[in-house]
Amino acid sequence: MKVCICGGGNLGHVVAGFIAAQGKHEVSMLTQHPELWSKQLVIDAPEGTSYAGSLSGIFSDARQAVSDADIVLLCLPGYAIRKTLKQIKAFLRPEAAVGSVVSSTGFFFQALELLSSNQVLFGFQRVPFISRVTEYGHRARLMGYKDCLYLAIEHAERPETLRAALADMLQTPIQLLDNYYEVSLSNSNPLLHPARLYDLWGDWQEGQCYSHVPLFYEEWTEHAAQLYLSMDNELQQLLAVLPVRKGSIPTVLDYYESTDAASLARKLRSIEAFKGIKAPMKATENGFVPDFQSRYFTEDFPYGLAIVRRLMQQKNIPSPTINMIYEWGLPFQSQ
């Protein structure tokens, strides 16, 4: 198959290299900076092995990148999805499948609006890998796998064929969900990150500096866990009134095998793949301040949490914790 990866971030590197290294597919990249990429992409895996994948092409031109692709996979932050869909739509083959590596930042809502009504769409509930770029365009770390991935597919005559192809590419079992709501509404990053950000800086004032940068997960507090659980409880009320199969989006406690805020905090502090990840901050001459340009702010509030909040308002479901945290983060979007 011919696969085009759109986006040169952490996930774009690892997904492209992982698929290309298998030697079964032609993998190309659509990126704003093709001149910074090598055709040989090295991926370092958590078990200590490394493997290299050869890219068939690296393009900034959408026509060159997607016109012969069987699968187009967006590995993009929420703010880049609409722009990229508009960029590629005229050059997509009618039978091409267009998808997103994670769907909680509005992929399906935007793709259904912008692309042909017959275009095959797919999207994952959670990212397949935990990924970090080591050397841009050349090397990246695959820091963690998922035991199983959950996928929604729309407009496909044979969804099972696409599911099986993606499972083979990602070397991970994939289960099909009933509809796109089940991947678009997530209690992962869109709730997880804002809960911790509010816990860290809910009382932050302009000009306030900190002496150090805390670890985002390894110092996770019980207060952050309780906020996360409250947001999840509100989301579960929304899911109950949508055409979503019960259990398709497990509760936070079920997913993390926890029983309360204290055990959830312990679990999040202990996850190996999360170790070493620092809170999004930047240095100033007086200390450290929150980095409002980080994807935690630029993606999880306006493209993750906002979708959940808007649907809850449409369904007249109270969401006091989600509202509180969303409204706290809203002023920082302009920064």
Question: Where in the sequence are the language-model features?
Answer:
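Rossmann-like NAD(P)(H) cofactor-binding subdomain of soluble oxidoreductases
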Residues: 73-74, 78-140
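Short beta-strand/turn micro-motifs composed of small residues
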Residues: 7, 31, 76, 102, ...
